[in-house]
């Protein structure tokens, strides 16, 4: 049979089948596990459909079908595979039954070919399933090996991780112990530092207290030194200078320099101190060369005594002895042996202070009186200056006023001499001016002094009266003048408003009158175009314009000068 099946599959078909498998973009895994179930469900479905379409006499029962299939239980292929049946690998039992019937039945070639084809398909399916099973077994074995390796590696990793955790715990415990020890050491160090800082602060406070007491005692000592006589102070200074022989050539020039600075106001003493400084320098040179400084020191001390007793007071002794570089190895000496001596000196100083206070009070009183006098004189001078400035301003204003009057009179004279006037017109103008002057005179002065005065005299009196009134206005308080000015301005504004209202009312009346006339008048009828010239000649009334301007200027001048 194998020889008969061999022509069905050639090498070309195998290559084609292999190429098709290679061209597939997917792989089928574990599909044959559910093949039996799918075939069984398909068979049931087809059987159900067939039974549904069959007649009643054509249908069979399950027992009859099982009886017809009972002979298949006697068949078994491949007993080495564990007695697996052939049903789940093949398309059905019909070809197998026909194959087992043997040569007893007569079959056609077509049936034989179909049987061979079915057999080949079964063998091919079996070989495919075996290969797949082998492949799956290899995969399972490989996966089991991988799982074992992974499990072993996981166990190793778990052991390493546990070891790492143990080491980490041990390190953390050691670190905590070290941190606790460091914290304890830090706290101990902090406590020691705090204790040391407290000790330093205590020492500093003690030093400050001691320095304060030392300053107080030095102040008292300097005070007592100031109260002591000058010759005793000089003796103590010389003793200190003689005690420090190694620094004698440094201290004495400093003392002499201080003496020269304090006595710079006295020229004769400066020259003597210069000689003593030279002597001290010569003494230092001789001491370096011969080693005999005692004679020169005594000579300079006598010179300093004689000069200090003549030139220095008690206020210079403190700065004379206050030198930072001087040594105070000697015990401090006091001039006052008994408290009564110090009290006596203090009483004398108190009396001197009282006399000085009295003298300063007298000087202050005299100074206050002098300041008061100076202030009064200054006020008088300022008032006189202000009065003179006011007089100056007044004179300037009068000058300006007179200049304006002169300009106005000059303008009037030009006005009277302007144009061609005849004598009658001048007489009429003079009469009108005299009448206006008389009216102004009556308003300003009155009717009592109107007898026998010409207009010029009346103008002089009116002018003098105006000057008096201007002076009186200047003497009136500024507040009253401002109040009167405000009243006048208010009256002017009220008058201007009234005039404006009257003008407005007049314009309204004129507009109303024009409107009434326009309403009453008969409407004009336009009878055609208005006839016009082709060219209109210019008007010949140009000569009237200057006359109108002259009349306007004359009217303005008369209104300005005579109203």
From Swiss-Prot:
Question: Where does this one sit in the cell?
Answer: Cytoplasm, Cytoskeleton, Microtubule organizing center, Centrosome; Cytoplasm, Perinuclear region; Cell projection, Cilium, Flagellum; Cytoplasm, Cytoskeleton
Oligomeric form and interacting partners: Interacts with CCDC42, CFAP53, IFT88 and ODF2. Interacts with CCDC146. Interacts with TEKT3. Interacts with ubiquitinated histone H2A.
Tell me which Pfam families the record gives. Answer: DUF4200
The GO molecular function terms of this record are:
ubiquitin-modified histone reader activity
Give the compositionally biased regions (Basic residues).
523-533
Coiled-coil annotated residue ranges, if any: 129-212, 384-415, 485-522
Q: Looking at the keywords, is Signal present?
A: no
Q: Which InterPro entries match?
A: CFAP_domain-containing, DUF4200
Q: Where is this region: Disordered?
A: 521-550
The name this protein goes by in its record: Coiled-coil domain-containing protein 38
As for what it does, the entry says: Essential for male fertility. Required for sperm flagellum biogenesis. Also required for acrosome biogenesis. Required for the attachment of developing acrosomes to the nucleus during spermiogenesis and may be involved in the transport of fibrous sheath components.
One GO BP on record is: acrosome assembly
One Gene Ontology term, aspect cellular component = perinuclear region of cytoplasm
- Give the record's keywords alphabetically: Cell projection, Cilium, Coiled coil, Cytoplasm, Cytoskeleton, Differentiation, Flagellum, Spermatogenesis
